[in-house]
């Protein structure tokens, strides 16, 4: 199994996803949550943007759409000939994108796929962080403002440490999603993309078991996938502990 170049590439793709997907998704989610909750006027009482409920609803909407529907929808948007994305870019004067294969080019296939997953998940984690930030006493932000801290300093030095445990939980969930990601990958690139550039272990496991009929090898792949998932979770807990997060149920 570990001498199979295709399996090793799928493992590498999973590791890339497990690193990039949580970082991008949580960064955007935290930035949007901070903007909505404490990103309003710096005058008077600390407050978020007006109509924040509307922004939360709109951002959360993609999360309630089934993953397979999202995959099919974006595969049509990315379509080289009749896709909406190429149509818009061409209309704006970018003629080089007239028939650009976003999912068919090895240079862009993984990035285009990650964008779709981030788009579908960022709203959920934004709402999660909004709820966590609202639990922080308003006096904490007021004191920071009186001391002269700006929005960015408040977000990084005050807000983020106080919701560290929420970030840890979100990171683990996103990591598990990245290590699976079967539905998104199968819908966007059923064959694993150009030169297997988007192939993940779950896809390789499915093909090995149900197309090739090699169930023993597929079980071994499943064990490797489970081990990688446990290792990822342990790594997140360890990093959080080293950075000063709570341990033993918040002790």
Predicted feature residues:
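A structural signal for multi-pass alpha-helical bundles of membrane permease subunits
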Residues: 1-251
């Amino acid at each position: 199994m570990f001498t199979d170049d295709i399996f090793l590439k799928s493992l590498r793709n999973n590791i890339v996803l497990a690193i990039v997907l949580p970082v991008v998704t949580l960064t955007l989610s935290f930035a949007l949550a901070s903007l909505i909750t404490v990103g309003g006027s710096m005058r008077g009482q600390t407050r978020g943007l007006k109509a924040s409920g509307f922004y939360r609803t709109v951002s959360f909407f993609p999360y309630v759409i089934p993953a397979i529907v999202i995959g099919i929808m974006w595969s049509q948007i990315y379509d080289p000939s009749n896709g909406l994305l190429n149509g818009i870019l061409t209309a704006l004067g970018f003629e080089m994108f007239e028939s650009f294969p976003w999912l068919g080019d090895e240079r862009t296939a993984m990035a285009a796929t990650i964008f779709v997953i981030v788009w579908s998940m960022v709203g959920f984690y934004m709402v999660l962080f909004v709820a966590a930030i609202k639990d922080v006493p308003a006096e904490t932000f007021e004191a920071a403002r009186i001391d002269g801290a700006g929005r960015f300093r408040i977000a990084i030095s005050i807000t983020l440490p106080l919701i560290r445990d929420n970030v840890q939980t979100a990171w683990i969930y996103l990591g598990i999603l990245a290590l699976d990601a079967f539905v998104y990958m199968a819908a966007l690139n059923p064959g694993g993309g150009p030169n297997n550039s988007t192939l993940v272990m779950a896809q390789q496991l499915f093909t090995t078991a149900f197309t090739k009929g090699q169930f023993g090898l597929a079980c071994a792949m499943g064990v490797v996938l489970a081990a990688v998932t446990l290792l990822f979770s342990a790594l997140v807990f360890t990093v959080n502990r080293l950075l000063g997060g709570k341990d033993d149920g918040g002790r």
